[in-house]
């Protein structure tokens, strides 16, 4: 096992512990709390994959951070902070929409790279809106926190979330997963739109019809889906 992988995990565990103390003292806002919960799941997955105990890793991580801070001068710290790009946290969903439990009548789950896609295949002939909470850096989507599909009535019918055991994903991973989710929902004659905020920072533009541009691979896949559906309908007639 690579030593840098282990030390990175140990430091992440300790920093999560520090952030948890901030929340316990009621000093964190809603996005801060949201990231804390998501990162907790990620750390558990990484700990299981690496075979490391989180409590023990936290103690070692504390020692690493204390050693670095002891060696770090105030001037160097100021320069580091000034040169680091700042990311923004954007929210399509409210805290209630983000934390609400939901259930699927006909569940389907698919893993697309480091992202997990869940769809309720029982949903038909609905208008569906995709909303997401994510961070942005340099005006581009950086990290997806959670994406959910909502009907006009407010029911959750689909979701895309990062896999805790596979931390880290690219903007292309997110766009591919959205394409899969759209295809799955449209299979049952649902009309799917993507929020303007998500379109802007994932694709760099927004369409009035709420549809992001699809990649050639996604277009071919959706064309095959349409042809298959037409053949199925003809056989039914």
From Swiss-Prot:
The keyword ATP-binding does not apply. Residues 223-230 are annotated as: PABPN1-binding. Residues 1-73 are annotated as: RNA-binding and homodimerization. Residues 217-237 have a biased composition (Basic residues). SUPFAM superfamilies: Ns1 effector domain-like (SSF143021), S15/NS1 RNA-binding domain (SSF47060). A motif (Nuclear localization signal) lies at residues 34-38. Its main location: host cell. GO terms for biological process: symbiont-mediated suppression of host cytoplasmic pattern recognition receptor signaling pathway via inhibition of RIG-I activity; symbiont-mediated suppression of host gene expression; symbiont-mediated suppression of host mRNA processing; symbiont-mediated suppression of host PKR/eIFalpha signaling; symbiont-mediated suppression of host type I interferon-mediated signaling pathway. The dsRNA-binding region is required for suppression of RNA silencing. HAMAP family: INFV_NS1 (MF_04066). Belongs to the influenza A viruses NS1 family. Homodimer. Interacts with host TRIM25 (via coiled coil); this interaction specifically inhibits TRIM25 multimerization and TRIM25-mediated RIGI CARD ubiquitination. Interacts with human EIF2AK2/PKR, CPSF4, IVNS1ABP and PABPN1. This is Non-structural protein 1. It comes from Influenza A virus (strain A/Aichi/2/1968 H3N2).
